[in-house]
Amino acid sequence: ENQAMGAPLVLRYRLEALPMAYIIIEPGGTVGYVGDARLIPRKKPELACAYALAGKYLGMRLVYLEAGSGADSPVPASMVALTKKLLGDVLIIVGGGIRSGRAAAELVAAGADLIVTGTAVEKSQDVASFISELTSSIRR
């Protein structure tokens, strides 16, 4: 329903539609609650991969593995690695629960092409230092 309501706006403003599978991993946070999502259990990476693969077969070029804003911990690196291995050229985005350069580096090493941080940046006492820590940790 929301996609149908938004589609005319995408057309009117000539926005590029990004075909993305949005997969919410437990705990899911607010996005899981508001979206009334069926959360993927953290210990079931094969289930996340099945959904991601379905997205690829439906023409989606991006997969977003989302633990939810302010999650206690990020999406497991093992889930990211398995998803990237299975999907290959599909861009993998990982967000939620990323609070350190080390966590970001683990996810990028596992196969994340992009990481998303929000709450951690918003709550940081020194935003510039935090962003510097993240970017220096993930440079390839």
Residue ranges with predicted function:
Residues 19-25, 63-65, 92-96, 115-117:
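Hydrophobic faces of well-ordered beta-strands that scaffold small-molecule active sites
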Residues 55, 107, 115:
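Conserved, mostly hydrophobic/aromatic
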Residues 53, 81, 105-106:
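Alpha-helical segments flanking ligand/cofactor-binding loops in enzyme cores
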Residues 1, 42, 63-73, 118:
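Catalytic beta/alpha-barrel core
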Residues 4-18, 73-100, 131-140:
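Alpha-helix-loop-beta-strand connector modules within alpha/beta enzyme cores
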Residues 1-58:
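Conserved anion-binding
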Residues 29-39, 63, 74, 78-84:
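Active-site/ligand-binding-proximal alpha/beta "capping" segment
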Residues 67-70, 97-98, 110-130:
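Glycine-rich phosphate-binding active-site loops on the catalytic face of alpha/beta enzymes
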